[in-house]
Curated annotation (Swiss-Prot):
Subunit comment: Part of the 50S ribosomal subunit.
Residue ranges of the region described as Disordered: 53-77
UniProt superkingdom: Bacteria
Name the UniProt record assigns to this protein: Large ribosomal subunit protein uL4
SUPFAM superfamilies in the record: Ribosomal protein L4 (SSF52166)
């Protein structure tokens, strides 16, 4: 599939070929749902923790006699029914991550890229070699494209990252870090020609 090649000023500089095995695959949205859930589960810190009956500070003595008081029998003041007692089956520190097949993850990336291409939300850039040092300069380049948010994929200089860092609707990412959640979370995906070649090697 032929696609036009532009620079960050949105001027045509040529054409490039997009592989239909990446940008024109069957749309299976359930795959995207599975992968986003997997990504969000992996990023959870899992540091939630409450004290159980064995963690609560307090005496181990029986509160009062088993019989003759007329009250319900109790064996510990650290039981959950008492104020300051432990929590039963409460959250503990754990990992929420689970495994997902590599084939599924790879196919999901193709589905996400195909979805963006189908909606005309993929732009192929010749490179990111621009001399910008200020956010205002980066903003002028971005305003050449009529989208609400941008994910720029390619090898970039630190100066470009610093210039774009303060724009909440612009994110830069290396080709190796491209993922389904970020693709779906941005309206427009900008790929450099080098990033495109890398993705072909990664996904085919």
């Amino acid at each position: 599939m032929e696609c036009k090649l532009v620079n960050l000023s949105n001027n045509d500089v040529g054409t490039t070929q997009l592989n239909p095995l990446i940008f024109s695959v069957e749309q299976k949205l359930s795959i995207l749902h599975d992968i986003v859930r997997w990504q969000l589960a992996k990023r959870r810190a899992g540091t939630h923790k409450v004290k159980g009956i064995s963690d609560v500070s307090g005496t181990t003595a029986k509160p009062y006699s088993q019989k003759r008081t007329g009250r319900a029998r109790q064996g510990s003041l650290r039981s959950p029914q008492f104020r300051g007692g432990g929590v039963i089956f409460g959250p503990i520190v754990r990992s929420h991550a689970y495994s997902l097949n590599k084939k599924v993850r790879k196919f999901g990336l193709k589905v996400a890229l195909s979805l963006k291409y189908l909606n005309n939300q993929v732009i192929i850039l010749n490179n990111l070699n621009i001399n910008v040092k200020k956010t205002s300069e980066m903003c002028k380049y971005i305003q050449n494209f009529k989208f609400s948010s941008f994910l720029i994929v390619g090898d970039y200089e630190d100066s470009l990252l610093r210039a774009a860092r303060n724009l909440h609707y612009v994110n830069l990412i290396k080709p190796i870090g491209l993922n389904v959640f970020d693709i779906l979370n941005h309206e427009c995906i900008m790929l450099t020609s080098d990033a495109l070649r890398y993705l072909e090697g990664r996904l085919l």
